Amino acid sequence: MAQVVGKLREEATPGEHLVLDRLRTNLPKDMTVYVETPISLYRKISNPDFIILTNYGYIILEVKDWRNFKANKHNALVQSTKGEIRHANPVTQARDYALDLSNAIRKTAEKIKVPCPKVPYGFAVVFPFVPAYHKKTLQDVWGETSVLFEDDLSSHMVNHSIKNTIREDMISPITKKTMELVRGTIYPETVTSDGVLLDEEQSKLVLETSVEEVAKPAEQPLPKAPKPTPQALFAEEVKPEPWNDLPLEGEKIISGNSVRLVRGVMGSGKTLVLLGKAKHWSKMFPDWKILVLAFNKEIAQLLKKELRGNPTIRTTHLDQLLREIITTENKYLWIYPLDARSWVRNHEDQYEIIQNLGCDFVADELSWIQEVMVSSREEYLAVKRVGRGNRIQISRKQRDEIYDLLEEHYREMEKKRQISWELLYLKFLEWVDSGELNPPKFDAILIDEAQDFAPSWIAVVNKLLKPGGNLFMVDDPTQSIFRYFTWRQRGVEVVGRTRYLKLPYRNTREIYTAAQAIIKDDPQLISQLESEGEEFLSGEDLTSMRSGEKPLLIVAKQQGSDVDFIEAQVQHLKRKQGINYENMCVILPVHREVARFEKSLSKYGVKVITSNRVKGLTFDVVFFCGLETFFVNGNPDDAAYSSNQKRIIYSCMGRAKQFLYLMHQNKISSYFEGLREHVDLYEL
């Protein structure tokens, strides 16, 4: 459901009421419809019926209730009770309004002394009551994309219809600052400097104001800011708790720190909130050193782009930061860390425990031991092992053998002067505690995709925080594609400090519902959430989401036919939908397949990426290939494995904003039976 600004005048026509209703209901939430908003340009005032602001430009719509009329390139003769009345070509009128707004945007940019960007625009006239058999004739006279009819405003057509009014060579995404400039031209008081567009709930999370912040006069130069207490930062919503009432695990991180967790469903704007919070703190406390941490380098690059121009904010991913700290301190010559999974596979023939439990199971167990910072064999034998489900249990003897493997792994690495990713975090903590490393300290650290940060990672983050520093995190447990840890396991007390974003806006309703079908009944996920006193967030009001086409589940009978299909489809989508190639993506489950797809698709600029690297990225079109490879390598009794596979699939499906293609070789696996009612099937 689109945001609507303004209202129709009392004497508005039935057609104008009908069009507004269709736009409000069928356009997505991230579009804004301005109703009868005057455009002021020098001494001229234009009054278009509707202005639609999107993330790829603006569209002017004029509405005509005409039913019987004749048209040529310049005029229309409209039948009325008073006879024929001549009207100027309304398409020309809509075009003039679009040009007026373009010039007004340039004038606004000059006034506030910023460069004037190119803003794509379109225009059209809507004829809600023209009989269907007249459509072709009218389109021939005034242009196919310049005239719209009632069916063009239906839920499955409206996005394509309005986008099609913009010339294909003009279409390109516009920045948030540009959108703010356009908003500020229409309503001058809405011009802002940071360019972040948030809905009401997101804005509350970003702009929660501390006691110290209220006291600062905005027009005065900002003095060196005193560090706010944890209680002050969240005084509006959280009653201060005595720190000695916190459990021991919470005190490890919480003591002296303000902790904030924003938990949201897929596509609810969690990252927008994080970006807004980082900019807000940077602006209010200019002497703070702020660190924004991403899960991987792809997300870090996107966040860095959004936060450029903020010199007090450092944006990176944790692996890169540790590498810089360690090599700067000359701890040792950097050797790219080993993958424990590869080490286990290389030793499968030597150890019966690997053969019995499987490589993936044993590798996950070795990682878990290190990530929860188990420090001895005795502790591992005694610790309660959670996260594996009830159908598979590890005996004490098997634990003993697994710990033997871990010690052998350590011995081999020490002999070869190597290190694993898991051990790197433990060594970092050891070196900091011993004084061998002196890492930089930050006043505030913000973590995106925090659900994938293991306890050892969070312990490292704590070492990077100044005493009394502030920790702000956003997460979604349903997208935890590695191991799941509760925040209590990670030493972070978030009870009473968690806020929720329940409204998804990124995907179409059809894509979101299909993705939800994969995980909504996952017993492992439900159990894990219940252990935190949480429940599964399924999205609040899906009726407000924009509608689109169902995902297409393609069953390929021949090996290799997937590449040919995708190449033909990306050309079709570019030609018919106007979607740029860089807004399309192919997701693969394994890296060895990347080269085969890139050979055919690299010339278009279509991104080809693996499922473990696509987290946090979004595209208009996603081709998710290789579904048949899921659920085949692990132990079917391993609840953690099955849940992990479902979350990977769910997260990858959620990367698609408009069109989603799911590709499966041969017969559809039983794991995907629940998808059938949410997709259209196609045999290739």
Across the structure, where does each feature detected by a protein language model lie?
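Pre-Walker A segment
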Residues: 155-266, 272-284
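Conserved helicase motor core of SF1/SF2 NTP-dependent helicases
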Residues: 223-224, 228-245, 251-252, 260-336, ...
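Coupling/switch/interface segments within P-loop NTPase motor domains and analogous charged loops
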Residues: 122, 129, 334-420
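Phosphate/oxyanion-binding active-site loops and adjacent basic polyanion-contact surfaces
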Residues: 11-16, 89-97, 198-201, 270, ...
